[in-house]
Amino acid sequence: YTDTTMALSGINKRRLDKLGVSYHCLIRDPQVIEMAKEKGITRSMAAVEVAANDSRQKIFIIGNAPTALCKIIEMVNENQLETAAVIGVPVGFVEATESKQALYESNIPAIVALGRKGGSNLAAALINAVMYNMDIEKLGDEYGRHTKQ
């Protein structure tokens, strides 16, 4: 799950498909928009709540919305969300530094860029780098930078 369509756009879909991984950005989902209005929360927070209902393993890729990162941490701490990992690199001044520090200090498996810097492009690059270094034999060399001899 990504917090922005921009992050999702930068992720290698062919590789995700090859791995059998589904990918979603719920920020424009009508259910998310309605929930955000009803609860008076950000759409990013509502998207995390909706994603929590997915029983499959999840990785959250957050490059823009510190509120999404805060919601992930809160829900994990309250045993309302299970996530395999989080890439937490929201950019900005408001809550970005604090949310990333909180993720860093949590027990959630994560890649975090501490401080103000980050962004959707970095989030996409990080998940792509993780995928590029996965089992190349399973993926086939046409999807990776490496070729096993």
Across the structure, where does each feature detected by a protein language model lie?
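Glycine-rich, small/polar surface segments that engage phosphate groups of diverse ligands
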Residues: T2-A46
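Short, acidic/small-residue loops that bind anionic groups at enzyme active sites
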Residues: S22-P30, L81-T97, I108-G115
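C-terminal functional extensions of proteins
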Residues: V94-Q149
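Short, well-ordered, mixed-charge alpha-helical segments that flank or form enzyme active sites
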Residues: L8-G10, V32-E34, A68-K71, F93-A96, ...
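Short, solvent-exposed amphipathic alpha-helical segments in soluble enzyme
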Residues: R14-L19, E74-L81, Q101-E105, I127-M131
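Buried hydrophobic positions in well-ordered alpha/beta secondary-structure cores of metabolic enzymes
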Residues: D3, I87-G88, L126
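Long, charge-patterned amphipathic alpha-helical coiled-coil/hairpin "stalk" segments used as oligomerization
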Residues: T42-S99
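Structural signal for hydrophobic packing residues in well-ordered secondary-structure cores
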Residues: L8, I27, S55, V76, ...
